Every structure is written in structure tokens, then in C-alpha cells.
From Swiss-Prot:
Organism: Nitrosomonas europaea (strain ATCC 19718 / CIP 103999 / KCTC 2705 / NBRC 14298)
EC number: 6.3.3.1
GO BP annotations listed: 'de novo' IMP biosynthetic process; adenine biosynthetic process
Protein name: Phosphoribosylformylglycinamidine cyclo-ligase
Reaction(s) catalysed by this chain's protein: 2-formamido-N(1)-(5-O-phospho-beta-D-ribosyl)acetamidine + ATP = 5-amino-1-(5-phospho-beta-D-ribosyl)imidazole + ADP + phosphate + H(+)
Family membership noted in the UniProt record: Belongs to the AIR synthase family.
Pathway(s) of this molecule: Purine metabolism; IMP biosynthesis via de novo pathway; 5-amino-1-(5-phospho-D-ribosyl)imidazole from N(2)-formyl-N(1)-(5-phospho-D-ribosyl)glycinamide: step 2/2
Domain of life: Bacteria
């Protein structure tokens, strides 16, 4: 018995592809990205990409391993990537946002999974994005062991996509960094960012809309767009080196909320951070944004990293050695403040 088909009087067969989902394109993407994923593999990764689940053995060197997880996206920085067709590095941003977060608790990133969603899959663009994700995983020393590509017709405008990532790391139970040991007179170090990283882009895009900006608009020796789309710096290798050499009391990844809101997240009761903004060089990009957007100083400090992508709190006797270790690992670092006693009615941070 043949079912009637009043909605399709010509009786042309319909398919998943004609409905907007191309399974073959998804399979081609998987084959394209396998070589990139293989370059990220660690010996603890069991199996490869393409299975229903990804397997990873906890490294045997840990006595009391504690798993640390983090998930994040790239936010509206993606909109600039679409507008200027810069897809090759946005995946680095995706990895950085999660691995830097779990690093704050002392964790070594182990593996990463990604989620790529679009209305219509463009294999070339998706390949560029995942290649960037793999690059970020290599920088972080973690394995890209799986992910999901979701082609969902009608969900996203043509040429646009969304990204999310998920990282898992491990730390010895007795070496978890939670800020509880921070005391008066400890030193606050700031490690340079590579730009806005992946935060504040809704404000950035508003500022761009209010000004005449072209793809070749200059900002010193680079273009404004290049400066804005510089990928988020990954601090994993340099900070793991530091943590192996010295006891780090606290770390803060300067993301949404800027310096004003992220540093207090790692401070125990009874202390506050006093930061001297004259101690580091604020990149000219932030000057441009503040000037062209008429953005108040406090708003800048609570939205952008203002040139500091990661904060380290360390005992005074270890501060100079920490600066040298980070410098030798390729970081630009400044002593930007100190920990002071806090009265109950005072703010947990002052940026002078």
C-alpha cells in the first residue's frame, strides 16, 4: 500500500540532504580533520576520532588525581571572524578560554572536545576552524579526542556558525590552587595578554559600528582588525613550568569582568588586591577603544583585560624568581600590585 502524498504532488522523493543536512559533507569533514587531531594525541588517549565516545586514561604519575573541567565559547568575536573571513585562528580562542580556566586551579589540561554548529556545513570553513582548534590543543599540550558537528538548517544565518569547547585536566589533590593561602604582603604579577582575547566583543562591535572602520584601518604597525582578532594567549606551558618550580598561591584568568571582577574571585576573606595600573604597558588597542567609544575607565577595567591576561599571586620571596621563570618561558610579566588587609566595608580590589 502506497501512502498518499498531497504535499508533494509531483512525488519527487525527498531526503535528508534536500532538507538541508548533508551527511556526506560531515563525513568528509571528519576525514579532513583526522590528521590535525592525530598531531595532538597523548599516550593516554585510547582510540581516535569518530567513535561514539572518547577514551582517556588518567596519567599514572598522579598519586591522588583530581579532574578539573571547564567549558566556554568565543562569544561575539565570531561575528568579526565571519565579517572578515578569519576562520583559521578562532579555534585557538576556543581552546584557550577553557584550558586557561582549568589551569587557574593548577590543572594540567589532558583533553579537549569541540562543538561546531551551523545552518549549512561549509567543509572548507569548518576545516579551518578545527585546524585552529588542533593548533590550540598542541599549544596547551592536550589531546583533541572528539567533538560534534551539528548541521541545523534554519538555525543560523548563511555563513555563520557557533562554537563551544570542553576541556578536562588533572591536578594532584594536595596541589590544587584555590587562593586560600593568599596572605597580606603577597605579590601580584600580571602576564601580558595578546589583545582583548575573547571578551568584550559586543562592546567592541558597538564601537566599530560608531566609527568608520575598514579592513585596512591601521593601528600602529598592524591593522585594527588583525589586532582585534589576534587569538587568545594560551598560558599552559609557561604556568605549568612555574608551578613545578615554585608554590603559586593564586591564579586569575582575566576574562569577562576584567581585572575588577576576576582577581577578587581568588581572594580569601580578610585581604584585598591593590593594583597599580602604571606598572604595565597598556596596548594601544585599548587606548583606541576607550577613545573612539568614549568608554569610562571603570568600564574598561570591568570589561577588558587591558593588557593583562593572567594574574599570579605569589609570596614576596618568590616574586623575582617567578618573573624570571615566566620571562624565560616566553611571557611578558610585570609586578602589578600586592595583597593588603581588607576591612569588611572596603572593596576587594583597588586599581590605582
Amino acid at each position: 500500500m502506497t501512502a498518499s502524498n498531497p504535499a508533494n504532488p509531483d512525488k519527487n522523493p525527498i531526503s535528508y540532504r534536500s532538507s538541508g543536512v548533508d551527511i556526506d559533507a560531515g563525513n568528509r569533514l571528519v576525514e579532513r580533520i583526522k590528521p590535525f587531531a592525530r598531531r595532538t594525541m597523548r599516550p593516554e588517549a585510547l582510540g581516535g576520532i569518530g567513535g561514539f565516545g572518547a577514551l582517556f586514561e588518567v596519567p599514572g604519575k598522579y598519586r591522588q588525581p583530581v579532574l578539573v573541567s571547564g567549558t566556554d565559547g568565543v562569544g561575539t568575536k565570531l561575528k568579526l571572524a565571519f565579517q572578515y573571513a578569519r576562520h583559521a585562528t578562532i579555534g585557538i580562542d576556543l581552546v584557550a578560554m577553557s584550558v586557561n580556566d582549568i589551569l587557574v586551579q593548577g590543572a594540567e589540561p589532558l583533553f579537549f572536545l569541540d562543538y561546531f554548529a551551523c545552518g549549512k556545513l561549509d567543509v572548507e570553513i569548518a576545516t579551518q576552524v578545527v585546524q585552529g582548534i588542533a593548533h590550540g590543543c598542541e599549544d596547551a599540550g592536550c589531546a583533541l579526542i572528539g567533538g560534534e558537528t551539528a548541521e541545523m538548517p534554519g538555525m543560523y544565518p548563511e555563513g555563520e556558525y557557533d562554537l563551544a569547547g570542553f576541556a578536562v585536566g588533572v591536578v594532584e589533590k594536595d596541589r590544587i590552587i584555590d587562593g586560600s593561602g593568599i596572605r597580606e604582603n603577597d605579590i601580584v604579577l600580571g602576564i601580558a595578554s595578546s589583545g582583548p582575547h575573547s571578551n568584550g566583543f559586543s562592546l567592541i562591535r558597538k564601537i566599530l559600528d560608531l566609527n568608520t572602520v575598514q579592513s585596512d584601518t591601521r593601528l600602529g604597525e598592524t591593522s585594527l582588525i588583525d589586532a582585534l582578532l589576534t587569538p587568545t594567549r594560551i598560558y599552559v606551558k609557561s604556568l605549568l613550568t612555574l608551578m613545578a618550580e615554585l608554590p603559586v598561591k593564586g591564579l586569575a584568568h582575566i576574562t569577562g569582568g576584567g581585572l575588577l571582577e576576576n582577581i577578587p574571585r581568588v581572594l580569601p576573606d580578610g585581604v584585598m588586591a591593590h593594583i597599580d595600573s602604571s606598572t604595565w604597558v597598556r596596548p594601544s588597542l585599548f587606548d583606541w577603544l576607550q577613545q573612539h567609544g568614549n568608554v569610562a575607565r571603570e568600564e574598561m577595567l570591568r570589561v577588558f583585560n587591558c593588557g593583562i591576561g593572567m594574574v599570579v599571586v605569589i609570596a614576596p620571596e618568590h616574586a623575582q624568581t617567578a618573573i624570571e621563570i615566566l620571562h624565560n618561558a616566553g611571557e611578558t610579566v610585570w609586578q602589578i600590585g600586592e595583597i593588603r588587609p581588607r576591612q569588611s566595608e572596603t572593596l576587594p580590589i583597588v586599581i590605582a
